[in-house]
Amino acid sequence: MSVGAHRTAPSAAADSGRWFRRYRATGSVHRRLLVLPHAGGSASFFHAWGTAFDPGTEVLVARYPGRHDRLTDPCVDSMKELADQVTEALLPLLDVPVTLFGHSMGASLAHEVALRLRDRHGVRPAALHVSSRRPPHRLNPKRVHTEGDEALLEEVRRLGGTDEALLTDPDLREIFLPAIRADFTIVGTYGPRRAAPVDCPVYAYVGDQDPDVPVAEMSAWSDVARGAFRLDVLPGGHFYLVDRHDVLVGTVSDRLLADG
């Protein structure tokens, strides 16, 4: 099925508003970029991306349940369930080409969403961008979600990318710890699996000092690409994209325009 031919029920449109923070394009919408955050992350982490692209690009950032705007929604602790729900919420927005960008856990989620769009709905994403995450067949999950609160929070702190106040303030910790544990349950139970290929360009990004994702492992995303594959290595660690924001966004922007 071609992009633009998809039709969905009104309830799916309502789900889109719940699942995505939507930064509307300043001109006519020619393409959409869906950003999928990391474990323990939220849409606000990618707020600067909302206005960083050309006028024809509408940016969507996933709002995972159990935090911020969705604090009262039940957390999701299964990759299958999370990917199913994100895919369904995206269906009303397939009238223009959609590119997927996922960071860390979000990279695995982006890959799963790309597969569901193709296999269940006959839609090929314009491209798949994956950041700071091993490909599916090279995963080595840590089961930190089975440990106590302090061990879990220490892992979050080690990786970075989460507001320190959420980790140290007792009241905030009580509010957000269930969502953090749910995310790390996804990470810890999503083990090695077949490198199911996608029918779109695959672009991979990693920091040269990432403690968990060596460059050689990131390059193995090429096994997922049936077509074009590019790997960009940037200075930094697991959250290189904070200090290298302008470089990364510029590269993603150029590829968005090239791919549709």
Residue map of PLM features:
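Domain-scale detector for complete catalytic domains at protein termini or as standalone homologs
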Residues: 1-101, 105-260
